[in-house]
Amino acid sequence: MKLAVLTGGGDAPGLNAVIRGVVRKATENGDEVIGFLDGWRGVMENEFMELDVEGCRGLLTRGGTVLGTTRINPFMREDGRDACRRTLEANGVDALIAIGGEGTLSCAHEMYKLGFPVLGVPKTIDNDIGSTEMTFGFATAVDIATEAIGRLHTTAESHDRVMVVEVMGRHVGHIATWAGLAGGASLTLIPEHPFDIAEVADALQRRHKRKFASIVVVAEGAKPVPGTLDIPEDSFDEFGHIKLGGIGELVAREITERTGFETRTTVRGYVQRGGEPSAFDRVLATWYGVEAASMAADKAFGQMVAYQCGSMTRVDLGEAVAGLKYVNPDLYKVASTFMA
């Protein structure tokens, strides 16, 4: 059997560990593996590399992806779908393992509906893919954000400042919630719960009356209650989203204007995606890769590997990409217990 692997969308710690897991299990099964370069672009343009056990040495701890990645969608390119079909047929690919987030997996699902032998592995540091409890890369991103929050506590206390820490999370606030709770944040603002900037300012004033410095964690997609915060037009990108670094700066500016407290902003940005995966993510990513190779051997096409209740299982790919997974309200209530 001949397997192919691709990595699409944004990079995440653990991608290489997944590739390594696929190759090791496939080799054990007597299968051959190739890796398409730069996501769906490599499939469309027939660009790939051979993958074997020897070539995967050192990948367990290595960040990024040796295959490269793009956000190219073959359905948005002229002849993209047919080009993919020609490539898979020309190379005798029996199973294509697509490792990616919502966009990559949605493409994989559409390809499956057209008869392609495709299956998916969920990848996103945002941990927002439905049907799976944990995606690799999330734990590493939380660790990075938590460390930043911990370091900023001493600066906030030394200067009696408010420190605003913006972390990734365009549509959901998993990273912000977990890192805010683990790092001892004073307030955590996430997309699922629109905030009232007046209430934020009041909470911080109450803290400072008790001589407490403050850390405010803000997910990049956090939204104010409509009508409570004026947002300049140049703060939005072409898709109507507040630009990375935008909401953190806006919140910091409003805090200063409303309270008089000196406020500084730190944007963690892409550092959350980079570098070595944590020990947990190395194990999780490896498990995902091994299970994906087993699914390919079983011809379990149109499905996605999912981590549920401490084990790996298989779920319908269409169901997995049908909706986002939001922050557990009970967990946010726990975080709220320690806010302000």
Feature roles, as predicted:
Residues 250, 303-340:
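Phosphate-binding loop/pocket of nucleotide- and phosphate-handling active sites
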Residues 1-44:
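N-terminal phosphate-binding or glycine-rich loops at protein starts, especially the Walker A/P-loop
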Residues 30, 34-37, 111-144, 189-196:
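Short, acidic/small-residue loops that bind anionic groups at enzyme active sites
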Residues 12-22, 44, 78-82, 96-109, ...:
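Short glycine/serine/threonine-rich phosphate/pyrophosphate-binding segments
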Residues 95-100, 106, 110, 138-156, ...:
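Accessory alpha-helical/coil subdomains and C-terminal extensions
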Residues 43-96, 103-104, 136-143, 147, ...:
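Glycine-rich oxoanion-binding loops at beta->alpha junctions
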Residues 31-36, 155-162, 214-216, 252, ...:
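Flexible, glycine/charged-enriched surface loops at secondary-structure junctions
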